[in-house]
From Swiss-Prot:
One of its GO terms (molecular function) is manganese ion binding. GO terms for cellular component: cytoplasm; extrinsic component of plasma membrane. It comes from the Bacteria. Mn(2+) 2 binds at residues 41, 80, 115, 196. HAMAP family: LpxH. Belongs to the LpxH family. Gene3D superfamilies: 3.60.21.10. One of its GO terms (biological process) is lipid A biosynthetic process. The keyword Nucleus does not apply. Hydrolyzes the pyrophosphate bond of UDP-2,3-diacylglucosamine to yield 2,3-diacylglucosamine 1-phosphate (lipid X) and UMP by catalyzing the attack of water at the alpha-P atom. Involved in the biosynthesis of lipid A, a phosphorylated glycolipid that anchors the lipopolysaccharide to the outer membrane of the cell. It comes from Psychromonas ingrahamii (strain DSM 17664 / CCUG 51855 / 37). This is UDP-2,3-diacylglucosamine hydrolase. Keywords: Cell inner membrane, Cell membrane, Hydrolase, Lipid A biosynthesis, Lipid biosynthesis, Lipid metabolism, Manganese, Membrane, Metal-binding.
């Protein structure tokens, strides 16, 4: 048996090849799969469950079919692009929403999973913005705005974020190693799986003097990648985006 982890597909109508690869992934990765965990940013942007494009509806349908036809559990942790995904869309997609930092036990192994943006403490401007956007009162007010206005605000936030990335160095946008260790020590785990940075890799490290691993599942811009947890091993799988064609 195995459990799969993906993140950062950033699905949108502008990149149909990624959507196609995701649907092929769901069609083919069914054998001996207990669960699929999506660690955020499945969509490029999400401004509320009341906005439904054809792609959003198709993704919900494909996910629900994947779960129900194959008896596979689906779990979701919000990303920085789609943290407004609510219970309504999650239910339609047969997904269970999880907290931003979540401890799970797989085949006798304790693992900490998260999107990963909370690990990037060097990006102080982003962390300030994140605190603001995750304020429940701010989210309540935002959801009360008309859809067209939310779209405009969402576009401005994304545009500002993309513009600032040009001037940020790689270290600022990467995880803060001390924060990784602190979090793993806090949760008493030797394995951490996350996304967000788009830097697919397995990092060997020490936590409380013991060997530990941090898996970055990567994004799907050029290749598809996922982490596969089995009883006796963990694999980081990287394949061409058209692998299932």
């Amino acid at each position: 048996m195995r459990t799969l982890f993906i993140a950062d597909l950033h699905l949108s109508e502008k990149h149909p090849q990624i959507s196609h690869a995701f649907f092929e992934f769901l069609q083919n990765e069914t054998e001996n799969v207990d669960a699929l965990y999506i660690l955020g940013d499945l969509f490029e942007v999400w401004i509320g469950d009341d906005e439904r494009t054809l792609l959003m509806n198709e993704v919900a349908l494909k996910l629900s079919e994947y779960a129900l036809k194959n008896n596979i559990l689906l779990y979701y942790i919000h990303g920085n692009r789609d943290f407004m995904i609510g219970k309504k869309y999650a239910k339609q997609s047969s997904m269970q929403l999880l907290p931003e930092h979540c401890e799970i036990n797989l085949y006798g192994k304790k693992i900490l999973i998260l999107h990963g943006d909370t690990l990037c403490l060097a990006d102080k401007n982003y962390q300030k913005m994140r605190t603001l956007l995750h304020n429940p009162l701010i989210q309540l007010v935002f959801n009360l705005l008309p859809l067209f206005l939310r779209k405009k605000i969402g576009w401005k936030i994304r545009h500002a974020s993309q513009s600032k990335k040009v001037y940020k160095n790689r270290e600022v946008m990467d995880v803060t190693k001390d924060e990784v260790v602190r979090l793993m020590e806090k949760h008493h785990v030797q394995t951490l799986i996350h996304g967000h940075t788009h830097r697919v890799a397995c990092h060997e490290m020490l936590v409380k003097g013991q060997a530990a691993q941090r898996y970055d599942v990567g994004d799907w811009r050029h290749n598809l990648s996922y982490v596969e947890v089995q009883k006796d091993k963990i694999n980081l799988v990287i394949r061409p985006i058209n692998f299932y064609n």
